[in-house]
């Protein structure tokens, strides 16, 4: 991942203010995107910027680095449009959005809206969530937030009722992108899964530090869930039936993630322990396991 986020300094153009771009990290922190907001800037054929950042050298020590970068726009040739009848209107090009609201919603899941470009403004009154009560669709309150990591994404949170039926709807023109496009109307219905479809995992842990967390893993070691160890116990609810691995991290600095330490400062990497068995359970089961992390398998 990037050690620091490069800050671009204009060389051959002068922005009207400091808010001339949106910043978006991508590829799990390995890349960064800059979305230009000023048309006087992004309409130029060539942009030159100076970027300063910290870069790890061959000894893995961070050193200041400054580069000059030039971006050249390659214009696509204008396509010839087919002749249309005088009374035939041009089709409207809408702001594209990928909405995550699956027809079978997990009880712990939430709705996401990921736009093709950052949003300049939106009308919160044009966003609706309705629940089917008996036979009547009833509006319910919800939380709608800008994602903290992806500048193009917004999240809708609600405490779903297991087995409940819902409808997510957005009026047309509710969202306007930074390049002038607006969204079409959206309507998606879905049903929340029942509690009986899930299982739970409870780990009774000994031998760990006072601050630690446990991660549940799939068969590729991908992290599926992360929970803190509280009073010697890590609890995972609403899991899909199947097989899981687990690992514990002694969270020395309490920041909720594994840290590699600092060689120059003599700080050791945080200790990691892997559970020596596969955790397997069926639907509507509770799997309770005792785990002494320092015990020899």
Question: What function would you assign to each model-found segment?
Answer:
Residues 1-297:
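N-terminal targeting or signal-anchor segments and their processing/structural boundaries
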């Amino acid at each position: 991942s990037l050690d620091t986020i490069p800050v671009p300094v204009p060389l051959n153009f002068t922005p009207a203010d400091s808010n001339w771009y949106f910043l978006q990290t991508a590829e799990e922190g390995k890349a960064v995107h800059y979305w230009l907001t000023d048309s006087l800037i992004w309409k130029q054929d060539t942009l030159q910027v100076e970027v300063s950042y910290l870069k790890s050298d061959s000894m893995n020590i961070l050193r200041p680095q400054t580069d000059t970068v030039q971006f050249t726009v390659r214009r696509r040739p204008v396509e010839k449009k087919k002749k249309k009848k005088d009374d035939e209107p041009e089709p409207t090009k809408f702001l594209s959005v990928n909405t995550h609201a699956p027809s079978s919603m997990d009880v712990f899941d939430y709705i996401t809206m990921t736009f093709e470009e950052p949003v300049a403004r939106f009308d919160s009154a044009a966003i609706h969530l309705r629940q089917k009560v008996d036979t009547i669709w009833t509006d319910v309150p919800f939380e709608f937030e800008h994602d903290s990591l992806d500048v193009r994404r917004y999240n809708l949170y609600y405490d779903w009722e297991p087995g409940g039926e819902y409808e997510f709807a957005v009026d047309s023109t509710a969202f306007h992108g930074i390049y002038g496009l607006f969204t079409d109307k959206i309507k998606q219905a879905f049903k929340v899964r029942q509690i009986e479809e899930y299982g739970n995992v409870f780990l009774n842990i000994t031998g760990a530090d006072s601050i630690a967390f446990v991660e549940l893993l799939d068969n590729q070691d991908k992290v599926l869930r992360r929970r803190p160890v509280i009073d010697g116990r890590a609890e995972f609810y609403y899991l899909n039936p199947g097989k899981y691995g687990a690992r514990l991290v002694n969270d020395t600095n309490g920041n909720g993630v594994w840290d590699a330490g600092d060689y120059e400062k003599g700080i050791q990497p945080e200790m990691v322990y892997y559970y020596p068995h596969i955790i397997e359970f069926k639907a509507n089961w509770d799997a309770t396991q005792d785990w002494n992390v320092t015990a020899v398998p």
